[in-house]
């Protein structure tokens, strides 16, 4: 019997949490993500693993996580290629205070049914600026941090909280006294093809 791959173990745990999302559109998005996680993986050309200075906050983030998710993340993390990006009008320190690592989709570790997924890490005191995008998005919050969505107020869902962003809605997130770590899932359009 072969050992369970770290990516499969983490995504199994994350998928189970996302499937438990609240009723309504959030639950529908969570169930779609879970269905796509079950699609047979297709290999891709994996990026070389890479850590950035902001990754020093991962230990603190893992201490905030549920123990089984923390252990699964710690097993997967050495395979990840952490990257940063510049965003116009971002707050000072943003470039050094955040990173993301793609898990599924282009530049990820593999492909599954058109689902694009990755981790976001935001250092304490740093805000990931307001933005929007066409794909519907659902987050599984792994550590602390706060979230905002157009028409709402900043809130802290806490570890294992679910955050849902309908297509095109403005949203942002920020580290508080602790770093924010979450896995996000960008859902393909319903008319999109399954890979």
Predicted regions mapped to residue ranges:
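Intrinsically disordered, low-complexity terminal regions of plant proteins
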Residues: 2-6
């Amino acid at each position: 019997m072969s050992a369970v791959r770290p990516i499969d173990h983490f995504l199994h745990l994350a998928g189970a949490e996302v499937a438990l999302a609240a009723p309504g559109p959030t639950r529908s998005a969570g169930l779609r993500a879970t269905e796509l996680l079950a699609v047979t993986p297709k290999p891709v050309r994996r990026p070389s693993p890479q850590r950035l200075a902001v990754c020093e906050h991962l230990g603190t983030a893992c201490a905030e996580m549920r123990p089984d998710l923390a252990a699964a993340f710690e097993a997967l993390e050495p395979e990840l290629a952490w990257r940063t990006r510049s965003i116009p009008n971002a707050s000072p320190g943003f470039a050094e205070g955040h990173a993301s690592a793609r898990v599924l989709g282009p530049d990820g570790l593999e492909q599954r049914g058109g689902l694009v997924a990755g981790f976001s890490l935001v250092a304490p005191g740093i805000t990931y600026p307001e933005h929007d995008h066409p794909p519907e998005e659902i987050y599984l919050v792994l550590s602390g941090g706060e979230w905002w969505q157009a028409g709402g107020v900043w809130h802290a869902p806490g570890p294992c909280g679910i955050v849902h962003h309908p297509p095109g809605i403005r949203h942002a997130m920020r580290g508080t006294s602790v770093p924010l770590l979450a896995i996000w899932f960008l859902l393909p359009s319903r008319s999109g093809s399954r890979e």
